[in-house]
Amino acid sequence: PIKGISSLGSVSLLHIQSNNGKSIGEIAARIFDILSRSDIEILLITQASHEQSLSIAVNNHQAQKAKIAIEKDFVLELKVEQMLPILIEENLSIVAIVGRQMKGVPGISGKLFSVLGNNKINIVAIAQGSSELNVSAVINSKDETKALRAIHKEFFKTIDESINLFLVGTGLIGATLLKQINESSISIRLCGLANDQLML
């Protein structure tokens, strides 16, 4: 069911939390309207299980604008502490696996999160599209490339992951090259060796 992997960098998360015991869902529509009127694109939305907090992903350059717009509209709620101060978490990236009917395939989301965890990549937030077409994870931008490689390796394994190698030169340079390849965990198939006196 997995058809591809996507990523988006330069992302910030706005953390919004209700402090009056009411579900954040009751004010979510108001927040979305504020951001829409401010021409701020919402990239991802995730809600905490206790339903009193909401995290919204926006582009880095729009994060402060979004925070100010929400604070302006909720000035009373913030003043009487019915809403906690809005926090911004910057320098994030969104990585996602894309496919069809993924909800009906057990273990897809868990597999994604396990891959990230096994590679020591911290997950800041997660979201699954209602259309069942994608599962997304928000991570630190510094881990974006590492995450994409790990996800691709896990979900798009090939039958033969080795490369053919014909090594010309068996001295220090050749030995160093083989050592570097070995340390990178790349599987190689040595097809031949040659130096200035012999070819095998």
Label the predicted regions.
Residues 185-200:
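NAD(P)-binding Rossmann-fold cofactor-contacting core
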Residues 1-179:
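A conserved regulatory-domain signal marking ACT and ACT-like small-molecule sensing domains
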